[in-house]
């Protein structure tokens, strides 16, 4: 399990990026960037690991963040029958919409959560955690909505940030000028 994910990480392209004068190494992977193509085999590999790792008992909804959580949310929904909710970058102004401030290591913006209601039992899944900025915005939004958080899982962990509560990861990596190194794996 996770051999396809690990291979995709170890062989993925790297680019240099810059933010605020700091140059850093950025890995480009199908699950975290949609480039190169996301294969069915990779999604099956990750979905099988998520199903074993997550507490999905009595879960009402899977919560994902736009955009790179959508494909893993779709795969997990197809495998479990549990519907998923996308936290969007666009405001819809629906009743009960929760506005989320988001600041990551790469960007700053606003997200919008709909269709999560009081008493919903939810799991959050996302492609990668590096600074924790996205999840730190989502957690208070779930409280505002009155949802019960059952579990959190990130496919890739780069940085192990403290988000105030425990979370699960499938693969922990480090990235340097030579590429991705796998530090730890759930399987």
Curated annotation (Swiss-Prot):
Q: What does this protein do?
A: Catalyzes a salvage reaction resulting in the formation of IMP that is energically less costly than de novo synthesis.
Q: Which GO terms describe its molecular function?
A: guanine phosphoribosyltransferase activity; hypoxanthine phosphoribosyltransferase activity
Kindly state which keywords UniProt assigns to this record, in alphabetical order: Cytoplasm, Glycosyltransferase, Purine salvage, Transferase
Q: Which domain of life is it from?
A: Archaea
Known pathway = Purine metabolism; IMP biosynthesis via salvage pathway; IMP from hypoxanthine: step 1/1
What is the designated name of this protein? Hypoxanthine/guanine phosphoribosyltransferase
> Gene name, please?
hpt
Q: Which InterPro entries match?
A: HGPRTase-like, PRibTrfase_dom, PRTase-like, Pur/Pyrimidine_PRTase
The protein's Enzyme Commission number: 2.4.2.8
Whether Glycosyltransferase counts among this entry's keywords is yes
PANTHER family assigned to the protein according to its UniProt record, in alphabetical order = HYPOXANTHINE/GUANINE PHOSPHORIBOSYLTRANSFERASE (PTHR43864), XANTHINE PHOSPHORIBOSYLTRANSFERASE (PTHR43864:SF1)
The chemistry this enzyme catalyses reads: IMP + diphosphate = hypoxanthine + 5-phospho-alpha-D-ribose 1-diphosphate; GMP + diphosphate = guanine + 5-phospho-alpha-D-ribose 1-diphosphate
- Member of which family? Belongs to the purine/pyrimidine phosphoribosyltransferase family. Archaeal HPRT subfamily.
Q: Where in the cell is it found?
A: Cytoplasm
Query: What is the organism of origin for this protein?
Result: Methanocorpusculum labreanum (strain ATCC 43576 / DSM 4855 / Z)
């Amino acid at each position: 399990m996770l051999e396809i994910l690990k291979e995709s990480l170890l062989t993925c392209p790297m680019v240099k990026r810059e933010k605020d004068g700091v140059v850093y190494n950025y890995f480009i992977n199908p699950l975290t960037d949609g480039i190169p193509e996301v294969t069915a085999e990779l999604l099956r590999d990750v979905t099988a690991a998520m199903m074993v790792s997550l507490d999905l008992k009595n879960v009402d909804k899977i919560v994902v963040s736009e955009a790179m959580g959508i494909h893993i949310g779709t795969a997990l929904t197809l495998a479990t029958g549990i519907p998923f909710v996308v936290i969007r970058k666009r405001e819809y102004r629906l009743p009960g919409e929760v506005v989320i401030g988001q600041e990551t290591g790469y960007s700053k913006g606003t997200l919008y959560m709909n269709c999560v209601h009081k008493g919903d039992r939810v799991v959050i899944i996302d492609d990668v955690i590096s600074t924790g900025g996205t999840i730190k915005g989502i957690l208070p939004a779930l409280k505002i909505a009155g949802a019960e958080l059952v579990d959190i899982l990130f496919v890739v962990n780069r940085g192990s940030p403290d988000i105030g509560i425990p979370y699960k990861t499938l693969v922990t990596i480090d990235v340097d000028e030579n590429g991705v190194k796998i530090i730890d794996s759930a399987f």
